[in-house]
A protein has these predicted regions:
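Generic detector of well-ordered alpha-helical segments enriched in charged/polar residues
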Residues: 10, 49, 107, 230-232
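Well-ordered beta-strand positions in beta-sheet-rich domains
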Residues: 20-22, 193, 230-232
Length: 242
C-alpha cells in the first residue's frame, strides 16, 4: 500500500511536457531579433557585408543591433575584432587581407521587421573591388562557412528552457548550430529557407517566449556570382505552447 502511494506521489510530482498550437492574435511583436555567430572562411571582413530585405520592400545595409567582425587568418585564428559597419572601401587594406587569405567571423544580433524577409551575407556590396582583386590574382574567395549559432528572440531564458523541457525541445531554437558547408567547385551561394515558429514555455514559476525553427538548404551554382550566404525566413501565424 505504501509503495502504491509512493508511485502515485512520484507521478503527481513529475513534470510532464505537452504542447498545443494556436493562432495568437494578441502577439503584437513588430520586431524580430536575429542572433548570429558565423565563420566565413574565405571572404575577408572588409569585403563582407550584411544586406536585409523584407516582404514590405525594405532593403538595407544599415543594421540595427550590435555586430562584431573578427578577422581570421587562414587557420581560423582571430587576428582582431571590430564593430561591424559598412564603410568606404580601402583598396590597399582589402588587397592585403585578400593576399593573406583571411576569413571573417560575424557575431552579435540585429533587428528586422517581424514579416517574411531575408538577410544576405555577401561580398556583392563591394563587387567592383572584388572583381578587380580576382582579375589581379590577389583574391580567391568562396562561400565556405560554419554556422556556430543562428537563433531568434531573446536568449536570456535559454538555460531555463533547456533545464525544464530538455535538450530535444530546446535545440529546436538552434536548428542550424554547427552546420558547416565546405567549398564545392562552382558553388557561389548557399540558400537557407527557415520557417520560424513563435514558442511559449510555461512552468510553475514563469512564462518564457522564444522561437523555434526548421530549415532547408541547397547550394546554388554560378561561376560569375559573388559568394554569398542567403537566409530567407517566414514567420508562422501559429504559436506552439509547452
Amino acid at each position: 500500500m505504501a509503495l502504491l502511494f509512493l508511485n502515485e506521489l512520484i507521478n503527481y510530482l513529475t513534470y510532464k511536457t505537452s504542447s498545443i498550437m494556436y493562432v495568437d492574435v494578441n502577439r503584437g511583436v513588430d520586431k524580430l531579433k536575429v542572433n548570429i555567430d558565423i565563420d566565413i572562411s574565405h571572404i575577408p571582413c572588409d569585403l563582407l557585408s550584411i544586406l536585409t530585405s523584407d516582404a514590405l520592400g525594405e532593403r538595407s545595409t544599415d543594421i540595427k543591433g550590435e555586430i562584431t567582425k573578427s578577422r581570421l587568418d587562414k587557420k581560423g585564428k582571430i587576428l582582431d575584432t571590430n564593430k561591424y559597419e559598412v564603410k568606404e572601401p580601402n583598396f590597399e587594406k582589402m588587397k592585403l587581407e585578400a593576399k593573406n587569405e583571411e576569413g571573417c567571423n560575424l557575431q552579435g544580433y540585429f533587428f528586422v521587421d517581424a514579416v517574411p524577409g531575408s538577410f544576405l551575407l555577401t561580398s556583392a556590396y563591394y563587387g567592383n573591388i572584388v572583381q578587380r582583386l580576382i582579375m589581379e590574382g590577389d583574391l580567391k574567395i568562396n562561400a565556405e562557412h560554419k554556422i556556430n549559432q543562428i537563433s531568434f528572440g531573446e536568449t536570456n531564458n535559454r538555460y531555463d528552457i533547456w533545464s525544464n523541457f530538455g535538450k530535444n525541445i530546446a535545440k529546436l531554437s538552434y536548428s542550424l548550430n554547427n552546420v558547416k558547408k565546405n567549398y564545392e567547385k562552382y558553388t557561389s551561394m548557399y540558400q537557407y529557407y527557415l520557417k520560424i515558429v513563435p514558442t511559449k514555455y510555461i512552468t510553475f514559476k514563469n512564462v518564457m517566449n522564444d522561437y523555434q525553427y526548421t530549415y532547408n538548404s541547397y547550394a546554388e551554382r554560378g561561376i560569375h556570382e559573388m559568394p554569398s550566404m542567403h537566409f530567407r525566413y517566414d514567420l508562422s501565424p501559429i504559436t506552439v505552447e509547452y
